[in-house]
Amino acid sequence: MKALTRHWFPIALIVVVLIVTLLIWKPWGDRFEPLPILWEAAQFELEGTSGETVSLSEHDGKVRLVYFFFSHCPDICIPTTAMLSKVQDELKSRDLFADKTMMYSITFDPERDTRERLLRFSEGYQADASGWKFLRGTEEGVKNLAQQYKVSVIKDQTGNFIHQNLFSLVDQEGNVRKVYSAGDPDVVASGDLIKQMADDMERLAR
């Protein structure tokens, strides 16, 4: 009994140290938990800014980020595209851009978003076409495609589009692994989502 009493303090100290260590490292453990497969990503073949056909499947083997927008958007699309430009920079700094990852910005509005318009728009955000494609299709086709990525969209009487501001993370095998919401301007402005998306893309790409 005396021996047990004599050793209880160092034993208790070890237990406390272990608990504190687990608490400190838990966020890192959560960070590296596997991302679940949510659903199979919808395939597409759309027109790029040079008139080329771009498909999701041609970039199998790369981690992909899919975003729906339109360049005449009066609010959230503009800061979100600026945010994607920073994601591009982050991926480049990690040697992931183009070789291991791709980003697609797909317009709801092919009537106004011509190839020339999309090219000028993309240049305004220093988009590197080797790893960030601005794409267009038919209005109805893109609407249906967006819905398959769980993005709802409604065309209003002014010709603008009311839509959810979501990103879909697609893995190398064509599975959607995560959906990010950027509907809150504060979230877009904070910079936290930029790092989160880049971190998740790196996790899948490595």
Predicted regions and their residues:
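N-terminal targeting signals for export/organelle localization
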Residues: 1-47, 204-206
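Short loop/turn microsegments at loop-to-beta-strand junctions
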Residues: 41-42, 63-64, 164-166
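Thiol-/selenol-based redox modules, centered on thioredoxin-like
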Residues: 156-206
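Structural microenvironment flanking redox-active thiols in thiol-disulfide oxidoreductases
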Residues: 81-145
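Short active-site neighborhood of thiol/selenol oxidoreductases, capturing the structured segment around
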Residues: 57-84
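A short beta-strand-turn-helix
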Residues: 44-64
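Structural micro-motif
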Residues: 132, 143, 147-156, 160-168
